[in-house]
Amino acid sequence: MLLTRALFIFYVTVVALPAKANDEAYLYVLGVAQDAGYPQAGCYQAHCMPGWEDPSLRRGATSIALIDPAAKTKYLFEATPNLPAQLYALEKEAPSEDYTFDGVFLTHAHMGHYGGLMFLGHEAMGGKNIPVYAMPRMQSYLRSNGPWSQLVEFNNIALQPLAHNKAVTLAGVSVTPLLVPHRDEFSETVGYLIKGANKSALFIPDINKWSVWETEIAQIIQTVDYALLDATFYGDGELPGRDMSKVPHPLVTETMQALSGLSVEDRNKVWFIHMNHTNPLLNPDSEEANTVRANGFNIAVEGIRLPL
């Protein structure tokens, strides 16, 4: 995967959406990789080496921010192990002197989605009742297991309850958690439907195969303006020795096939995100990335804005 700095800059320029518009709420992409980021710890294979040798090619674990200029608030979706860098990126986009950091929405208890909560504790930021929105099992896990329980006991975070398909209203934006099937060892797993004044987004960074979800993914995409979808693995053969059909994620090739009947307009709503370090979509010049774009889909990169 021979990425170059120039190619990366070109690619971001091509896909970045329009700059901030007045007081319109928007989503801001902070990370696009699977839980362990790119390059992954301990990976010194050819596909990881560009990231070690050129820091500009590194990618953080998947996270998006909700920024509301009218309400002067900002929220995170996911607290990743890359939280320090992602908070800095958010600070540059929405400075704390102008925006209040009003909370974190969690999807589930896998390392790349909640591990960054540790930086809110007294050894680091020393947060003061930072709202953390979580489903019941996720809340119970945080309350009952250290070191997370200390965040609750020391009032670094203030757990906020969520319920399936029950909207949380945040000034001019609503956030609705949707239960999705996944490896739920420690908590439920949810995606989020995020609705602004004009547009809406579906955020599902982790899910098992689309066929085991009670919701038809093609149908829901027709009802939203953006769909940031699980793209952990691209296709067959990506993990040597593994039967990719049994990996509990929808392959990008499977998702494209499932959505092939949609109009080009609807396919344009899809932004693939949460890419494993093996995923060739991390290389914007790869044959696979070209195939995705040729079929009308998008590949998320850090720094894009999705106006709501």
Would you name each region that the model predicts?
Residues 198-200, 207-305:
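Cap/insert and terminal regions of metallo-dependent hydrolase folds
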Residues 104, 134, 202-203, 272:
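Structural beta-sheet core signal
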Residues 137-146:
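A short, active-site helix/loop in glycosyltransferases that binds the activated sugar's phosphate group
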Residues 1-11:
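Sec-dependent signal peptide recognition
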Residues 14-18:
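N-terminal signal peptide c-region/cleavage motif recognized by signal peptidases
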Residues 22-92, 96, 159-220, 304-308:
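Core dinuclear metal-dependent hydrolase active-site scaffold
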Residues 23, 128, 152-158, 171-173, ...:
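A short helix-to-beta-strand connector/capping loop
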Residues 60, 67-133, 223-225:
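Active-site metal-binding motif and surrounding structural segment of the metallo-beta-lactamase
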